[in-house]
């Protein structure tokens, strides 16, 4: 329900059920929103570490929900940022989120605008938007973008021009072909193709494809989520729970 965030509720309600592989019985039910936020943030942090400029100083986040907070945590873990710019549909939600960022991470946070977006070295988009959140001309060269909000073919956070002019890395190419509106829409307009994807994040990590080649190129990580990430996180949680009990 798209009105849920205004009510202080998650956009989507979900749960993750964990089963014992040897016995077949359910051993835990995890909050799906928390699992999604943690694993999505972790992957964005990894992508930022592999693709953002080493001297990145300014981060920007579009959105003020649980996912946005995990994105901020992730990029702060990956780079020594000095401030975060917050972009939201309302001034009130942006101000509140700036306070959350400062109180949680002890880093300066301020409301962003079109002009200040050019300062950003790392941008995270975490919204259910159906139209681009910014214009390509608002970006600086060398920026890295984590686009994680759109997960349906009709959703779009990133301008077509930005997709065309970026080195695009994805979490899973087959999933993006079905769900990544940020990539599907440019294809429908005849301006891009999946053959132009530089590679998957795993390939960058393994050294099979290059990451950032220069401080001047724009890199974009598109993630729609991957079930193996949920499994990996659930496994970590269960191991920690079992260790805490012993």
What name fits each language-model region?
Residues 156-245:
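Adenosine-phosphate binding glycine-rich loop
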